[in-house]
From Swiss-Prot:
Keyword line: Endosome, Lipid-binding, Membrane, Phosphoprotein, Protein transport, Transport
A Gene Ontology cellular-component term: intracellular membrane-bounded organelle
Classification via Pfam families: PX, Snx8_BAR_dom
Subcellular location, record wording: Early endosome membrane
Residues that bind a 1,2-diacyl-sn-glycero-3-phospho-(1D-myo-inositol-3-phosphate): 109, 135, 148
Sequence segments annotated as region (Disordered): 1-36
Annotated function: May be involved in several stages of intracellular trafficking. May play a role in intracellular protein transport from early endosomes to the trans-Golgi network.
GO biological process: early endosome to Golgi transport; intracellular protein transport
Protein name according to UniProt: Sorting nexin-8
UniProt domain PX: residue ranges: 73-181
PANTHER family for the chain: SORTING NEXIN-8 (PTHR46571:SF1)
Keyword Transport: yes
Amino acid sequence: MTGRAMDPLPAAAVGAAAEAEADEEADPPASDLPTPQAIEPQAIVQQVPAPSRMQMPQGNPLLLSHTLQELLARDTVQVELIPEKKGLFLKHVEYEVSSQRFKSSVYRRYNDFVVFQEMLLHKFPYRMVPALPPKRMLGADREFIEARRRALKRFVNLVARHPLFSEDVVLKLFLSFSGSDVQNKLKESAQCVGDEFLNCKLATRAKDFLPADIQAQFAISRELIRNIYNSFHKLRDRAERIASRAIDNAADLLIFGKELSAIGSDTTPLPSWAALNSSTWGSLKQALKGLSVEFALLADKAAQQGKQEENDVVEKLNLFLDLLQSYKDLCERHEKGVLHKHQRALHKYSLMKRQMMSATAQNREPESVEQLESRIVEQENAIQTMELRNYFSLYCLHQETQLIHVYLPLTSHILRAFVNSQIQGHKEMSKVWNDLRPKLSCLFAGPHSTLTPPCSPPEDGLCPH
């Protein structure tokens, strides 16, 4: 391949976790990934295929047959904060990770997620492995801890629903192993296994299944997905602001009601010159004090709408953005990894051939020429393997591009959740406002235009005159 291919808890629990995060000094994630033994290109075909394979229709194995509903139904994983601080000297943040599919509930630390992701990248370097959120930041607060929990939940759900990852032993270990040494178990599962290229029976024939215009197709797909990412990033930002405004509106309504109650509860005596209006002022204070209940209810409804849109709209947008970002990261790995290595190997081979021609022309010693010939043969084998990996990387990229398109209907789910939230929120708020109107009418319904306290019927919201 030449040229450009593709672009790349409750509040108490959160608060306790924020304190723990400030002192967290977890063990550094081990980077000693197991290194598979080198295998000649001719022997690759004889590798025993891994038991887990992408679901493929009869015919071209490059094409996938999945629906969004099938992917979403594979598993739903919950990630919740555990506020307890463990360790004699070091304090950590722990998460309870629960899987519907495996009917399991295990405790995991952030570094367990790191090793889990490392094993996925080790075994599946040509697939969309989602990124992890940052480990920590100085003075980590409740918002950071909660944002990281949400990001870890999105990460593990994307992995659990991936057609290939979902059938791998690494995922099962992470979601169901209840021992204390889960990191070692994850590493052991990858020892001497090698990556997907060494285990896939189609790896050496990947080129045969790729379309002739693969470069043009991927250039178009890359541009499309880049545009989709940029648009969804803006949608997410707007959705965040809409949800945030609903929560801010709730806070303002609550304060508004409290101030009305404060006015109604004021006991400061009236001056003598205002004694004639004392009854009017007293009635008005009673009325204002009674209205605070409705404003508290309005605040509650607005807060519910904001939280619902955070969970059902913003989080779904973040999930899709995480998926798109993993695709961009995959493209970058392809260009900076296998493609770059292939090009360097070709350049090195070209230099060797020149040296060989020069040695032959200068009649160098036979031993020197034989050594150079041996190195050239080794380089040819390396180039052959890299070329096979390059085509297999393109093969996987093509399938991952298909998965992105399978997830595109998630847009309709997000829009439906947003519209339903707006309808429900406005409907509930409208009902409370309408219930409030009769009470305002009561303020002006007294005899001789004297203000009377608002009536607060418990059920029907009607105010008898």
